[in-house]
């Protein structure tokens, strides 16, 4: 037996020991604890608005913190800022690269960011004196595509990339202030904790990791998926997070229990998950799928509570407003739909 093979076996044994130690601490399952809770019943949501304007696949969307404006990014090379109440376009921003994969709205509402196969995170100022939108900063540094970005504030943004790293940037200087390394596959998604001190990442190594923004360290790693993790989203309390994967399952991981609590899957679902988001209370988990639908899961009991059907192609992105009153889904059919 080669030395490498021996080390592989030892690592596998250690992994199993860790799994066993976690299970030993697990005095009850979430299903047991929630067994006497009422189910959420049938969740039926309607499309209240359809946002038409993109001319090609929509790849990403992100709500503004006012729960009214949202930004979307499309293969047509446009970033559009929408008023979800009126369906009006506030801004249509032409991008230098049409291969955009992610977009983000700053908490202040002053900036939006985007990036993709250009490996650059571009920051746009929406509140210029002249009234026009322009690039205020470009952040080059990743050696792979930009898969996700999220603002901490107007001065800092976190990005994840196909180069297997995440990075914290000082927007003013354009420099990476912290690099988060540890994944062994493309990092596909990130989600900031409510207190903005940590974030979780999901990657093509089928693992998700919790990172400390303050010191750049990986605090916890979570495994269980058997394929790429495409999406991650923090539970509103900040003590748990959900993941969505190409293995056709979503999973709920608890930071304090240090393990998986629940698996969301259905015999009829055999396609990958592109996006996940919790309702404001955390009781519902919404997940977008390659089969054109969006499933609504009972986050605590694990059952499927509803389906949002209406898109004519893959649901590529979704988001719940800060006030919890609406869900937006974006699709390869070039439309965004607002549901509640």
Swiss-Prot record:
- Biological function: Guanine nucleotide-binding proteins (G proteins) are involved as a modulator or transducer in various transmembrane signaling systems. The beta and gamma chains are required for the GTPase activity, for replacement of GDP by GTP, and for G protein-effector interaction.
N-acetylserine: residues carrying this PTM: 2
One Pfam family here = WD40_Gbeta
Q: Does the keyword Phosphoprotein apply?
A: yes
Q: In which tissues is it expressed?
A: Widely expressed in the brain. Highest levels found in the hippocampus and layers v and vi of the neocortex.
Which GO biological process categories is it annotated with?
G protein-coupled receptor signaling pathway
GO CC, alphabetical: cell body; cytoplasm; heterotrimeric G-protein complex; synapse
Name recorded for this polypeptide: Guanine nucleotide-binding protein subunit beta-4
Q: How does it assemble?
A: G proteins are composed of 3 units, alpha, beta and gamma.
- Which GO-annotated molecular functions does the record name? protein-containing complex binding; signaling receptor complex adaptor activity
What the record says about family reads: Belongs to the WD repeat G protein beta family.
Phosphoserine is found on 2
User: Which InterPro entries is this protein grouped with?
Assistant: G-protein_beta_WD-40_rep, Gprotein_B, Guanine_nucleotide-bd_bsu, WD40/YVTN_repeat-like_dom_sf, WD40_repeat_CS, WD40_repeat_dom_sf, WD40_rpt
Alphabetized UniProt keyword annotations: Acetylation, Phosphoprotein, Repeat, Transducer, WD repeat
Tell me the CDD domains matching this sequence.
WD40
Phosphohistidine PTM positions: 266
WD-type repeats, residues: 53-92, 95-134, 141-179, 182-221, 224-263, 268-307, 310-339
